[in-house]
């Protein structure tokens, strides 16, 4: 995959984007609108608590999600120079054609029969909102929700909240469809620095801790974050069965490893880390059900 220099691309100052981690600007590249995500500043932050790898996580996880059957944003890695040259993740703006993005938090607030606000991530409340909302077919939306959960489990996403998935609405026809999944920067242990990566590669206890202990889902049951491994083990023959049947057969670790090898800017130990981590997550989450 050829690296891209976005420095001289036309800036589009009329577009702005939400999100807490890192600066974001819009540029025109190859006749499309792209959102450039910059790595967060590490000033006055311990390395292990920064998200210095979030741009890599965003690109790798978004692309892998598409590879294994979840419709997700299209991303590219490149550089942008403004005094310093930084690696950035470019995300194709899927609202550039005029459609309006409504996140699930906004939709949740329209369900007047719900007793909780839009930001609540209690699983039963989220599922109730899926049934009661009137934007898209609830059956289709529930299938997408569980597909996204399975993919997030594989990728180790600890921040799939109600503000980073949702719907695209055509302002003229008022018709809605499910938006591509986006905001994958909290996948694949973005806080891991070089030392942690090497420890995870070389120490099974360090690796297992980052599979069985954390990260957990942002979804909750009775106020407690859902652990991915236990939840999938308990529900593989229940609510998760259709999504597991759709997603898991499409997870080709050899194909994913080839993609990682073809990704620019990564050091050899980073490539090794992502391969080891994904293989271990696959085994812990899915192999026992084969």
Identify the meaning behind each predicted range.
Residues 2, 8-12, 124-138, 193-196, ...:
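A short, terminal or domain-edge coil/loop segment
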Residues 59-67, 143-151, 276, 280-283:
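A broad, structural surface signal
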């Amino acid at each position: 995959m050829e690296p891209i220099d976005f420095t001289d691309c036309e800036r589009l100052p009329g577009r702005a984007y939400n999100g807490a981690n890192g600066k974001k600007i819009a540029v025109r590249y190859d006749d499309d609108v792209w959102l450039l995500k910059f790595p967060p500043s590490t000033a006055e932050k311990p390395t292990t608590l920064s998200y210095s790898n979030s741009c890599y996580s965003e690109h790798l996880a978004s692309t892998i999600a598409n590879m294994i059957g979840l419709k997700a944003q299209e991303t590219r890695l490149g550089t942008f120079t403004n005094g310093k040259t930084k690696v950035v993740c470019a995300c194709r703006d899927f609202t550039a054609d005029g459609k309006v993005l409504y996140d699930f938090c906004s939709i949740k607030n329209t369900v007047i029969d719900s007793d909780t606000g839009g930001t609540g991530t209690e699983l039963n409340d989220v599922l109730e909102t899926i049934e009661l909302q009137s934007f898209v077919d609830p059956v289709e939306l529930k299938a997408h929700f569980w597909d996204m959960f399975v993919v997030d489990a594989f990728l180790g996403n600890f921040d799939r909240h109600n503000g980073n998935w949702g719907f695209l609405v055509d302002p003229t026809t008022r018709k809605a469809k499910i938006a591509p999944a986006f905001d994958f920067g909290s996948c694949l242990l973005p806080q891991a620095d070089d030392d942690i990566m090497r420890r995870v590669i070389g120490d099974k206890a360090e690796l297992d801790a980052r599979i069985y202990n954390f990260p957990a889902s942002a979804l909750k049951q009775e106020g407690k974050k859902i652990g991915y491994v236990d939840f999938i083990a308990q529900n593989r023959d229940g609510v998760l069965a259709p999504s597991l049947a759709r997603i898991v057969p499409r997870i080709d670790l050899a194909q994913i490893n080839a993609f990682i090898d073809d990704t620019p800017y990564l050091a050899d130990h980073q490539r090794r880390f992502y391969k080891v981590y994904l293989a271990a997550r696959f085994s812990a989450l899915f192999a026992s059900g084969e």
